[in-house]
C-alpha cells in the first residue's frame, strides 16, 4: 500500500518549516496541525497521514510504553531490554542499516524512519524529547540500560539535541488510531557509515510535561520494506528559498 505523506502537496510547501539555521537555540517543532514539517539538525520531520499499511508492509523494530509520564528505550535483540521496552522479538530487535529504505530529496539521500504514537483520545498530545541514532559494526550483547548502547564501539550518528535541547510536538488525534503512522523522520544518509552496520534508535517521549505526557498505549518506530518514492511535488526542497521562516523557538 502506498504511503501518502500528506493530504495536499501545496499546503505542505506553504507551511514547510525551516529550522536548520540557528543551532545555538532550542527548537520546538510543532507537528500538531495537519500540514506541518521542519528541520532539526539537518533531519527533516513531517507529519504523515499514513493509514494502516498491512502485514509485511512495515517493519516494527522498537516499541516503548509504560504507565508513566515519560517513556524511553531503544531497539535491540539482546535481552533484557530497558524496562519500558516491549520484549517481543517481533517488535523490538536489531536492524541492519541497509534494511532501512532511503529517499532522495532534491539530490540528497535520507534514511526514512516511521513513528506511530498512541495516546488517549481525550488527551492526544505527546512530546518527542530525545532522538539519538547509533551504529555499531557488531550487534549489542546487552541492552538493559542506555549505557549499554552509548558505551564501547557505538557511534552516535544523529542527535535531536545536538547543540540545543530540542523537541517535537505530536498529536495522536490527527490520525485514525494505532497502526496509522504519525510522523516520518528523514535522517541524512551522509551521517552514516557502512550499510552492514547495526543501527540503534533511542527515543524518549513525554518529557515536556503537562498536556504532552505519555498516557496510553505504546510508541513504535518502524521502517518500510521497500525504497520509497515521495509523491511528485510533495517534498520539493527547491521551494525552501521562497518560504518564510516559521520556526517557533523556545526561550
Question: What is the role of each PLM region?
Answer:
Residues 3-5, 9-10, 14, 23-28, ...:
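Short, threonine-centered small-residue motifs that mark membrane-proximal processing/anchoring sites
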Residues 17-23, 245:
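Hydrophobic membrane-targeting alpha-helices
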Residues 27-228:
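Surface-exposed extracytoplasmic segments
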Residues 138, 239-242:
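Residues that form or immediately flank small-molecule/cofactor binding pockets and catalytic motifs
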Residues 246-251:
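C-terminal membrane-anchoring or membrane-association module
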